């Protein structure tokens, strides 16, 4: 049975001291957490770490059956998402089970992904010339799309992490969990072309480190720097809809499932602690199939 303890108190202290929430708002959060804890105890779930996306769906169904207003449900979702975001920040959990639950409609918030023509436009940008930073961006795009790793994980890749004989990269994920992810021929060729230019750039600025990706001064490329580079690539590709770099990870998972990969393998490649975090992509692939049908079938 889950009882109120140190985690909850730390969260409430965080709301008061760092978020400056009012007493009324904090009380609402406490009540929402109390109600969720009651539900977990009824489900024989003994720790917050055990909660999965499917448990969240069951809880939302229960709220709907109790005829809570949409506003109340949205507030409860917001409270619990904030609590789990706090647990994630404190390294208590590896995945936030509330990530893909929508505030407004109490529905899944499906991950967005790139369509094939959009991916082609992105790759055209990084293959337009062989300048040093273009070669770097080519590695960036080929590795992110080819492995599905997070932007933060990409920033942490060191040269010793590359195993070119097996075409695999050692990745340090959330909670410092390590996993090997394979990469394909395109990524291998991009890395091979880039490494000599990386050496030249670092020598020019007298830099010495093992980071795979570097900026224009030869320093390690940070997570923020990677996001900036990707934003520039997206801008050059003239893609019109609202796009964010994490969509490359979503596209990796969606493309694998669309082409017959099994769920467990995709889970392992993504570094998801829970299979429920990966199951969200089955909804994406169904939506993709439906949208493709509606777009291309003459009788749709």
UniProtKB/Swiss-Prot annotation:
Pfam families named in the record: Phage_int_SAM_1, Phage_integrase
Biological process annotations from GO: cell division; chromosome segregation; DNA recombination; DNA transposition
Entry's localization field: Cytoplasm
Residue ranges of domain Core-binding (CB) in the record: 2-88
UniProt keyword annotations, A-Z: Cell cycle, Cell division, Chromosome partition, Cytoplasm, DNA integration, DNA recombination, DNA-binding
Cysteine disulfide links: none
Single GO term (MF): site-specific recombinase activity
GO cellular component: cytoplasm
Active site per database record: 150, 174, 246, 249, 272, 281 (o-(3'-phospho-dna)-tyrosine intermediate)
Annotated Tyr recombinase domain residues: 109-294
Gene3D superfamilies: 1.10.150.130, Intergrase catalytic core
Record InterPro entries: CB (IPR044068), DNA_brk_join_enz (IPR011010), Integrase-like_cat_sf (IPR013762), Integrase_catalytic (IPR002104), Integrase_recombinase_N (IPR010998), Integrase_SAM-like_N (IPR004107), Recomb_XerC (IPR011931), Tyrosine_recombinase_XerC/XerD (IPR023009)
Family affiliation: Belongs to the 'phage' integrase family. XerC subfamily.
Annotated function: Site-specific tyrosine recombinase, which acts by catalyzing the cutting and rejoining of the recombining DNA molecules. The XerC-XerD complex is essential to convert dimers of the bacterial chromosome into monomers to permit their segregation at cell division. It also contributes to the segregational stability of plasmids.
UniProt subunit comment: Forms a cyclic heterotetrameric complex composed of two molecules of XerC and two molecules of XerD.
Protein name in UniProt: Tyrosine recombinase XerC
Organism expressing this protein natively: Listeria monocytogenes serovar 1/2a (strain ATCC BAA-679 / EGD-e)
Gene it is expressed from: xerC
């Amino acid at each position: 049975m889950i009882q109120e303890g140190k985690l909850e108190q730390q969260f409430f202290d965080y709301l008061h001291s760092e978020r400056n929430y009012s007493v009324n708002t904090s009380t609402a959060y406490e009540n929402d957490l109390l109600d969720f804890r009651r539900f977990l105890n009824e489900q024989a779930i003994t720790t917050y770490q055990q909660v999965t996306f499917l448990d969240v769906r069951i809880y939302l169904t229960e709220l709907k059956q109790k005829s809570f207003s949409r506003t109340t449900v949205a507030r409860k979702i917001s409270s619990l998402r904030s609590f789990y975001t706090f647990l994630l920040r404190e390294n208590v959990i590896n995945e936030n089970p509330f990530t893909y639950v929508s505030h407004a409609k109490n529905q899944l918030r499906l991950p967005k992904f790139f369509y094939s023509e959009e991916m082609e436009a992105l790759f055209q940008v990084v293959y337009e010339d062989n300048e040093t930073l273009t070669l770097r961006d080519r590695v960036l795009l080929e590795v992110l799309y080819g492995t599905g790793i997070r932007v933060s994980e990409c920033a942490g890749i060191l040269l010793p992490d590359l195993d070119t004989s097996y075409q695999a990269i050692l990745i340090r994920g959330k909670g410092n969990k390590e996993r090997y992810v394979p990469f394909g021929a395109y990524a291998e060729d991009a890395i091979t072309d880039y490494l000599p230019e990386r050496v030249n750039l670092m020598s020019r600025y007298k830099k010495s480190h093992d980071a795979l990706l570097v900026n224009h001064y030869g320093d390690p490329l940070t997570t923020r720097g990677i996001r900036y580079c990707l934003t520039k690539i997206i801008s050059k590709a003239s893609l019109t809809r609202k796009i964010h770099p994490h969509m490359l990870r979503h596209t990796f998972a969606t493309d694998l499932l669309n082409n017959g990969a099994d769920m467990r393998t995709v889970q392992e490649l993504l570094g998801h602690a829970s299979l429920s975090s990966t199951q969200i992509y089955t909804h994406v692939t169904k939506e993709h199939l439906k949208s493709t049908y509606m777009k291309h079938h003459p009788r749709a």
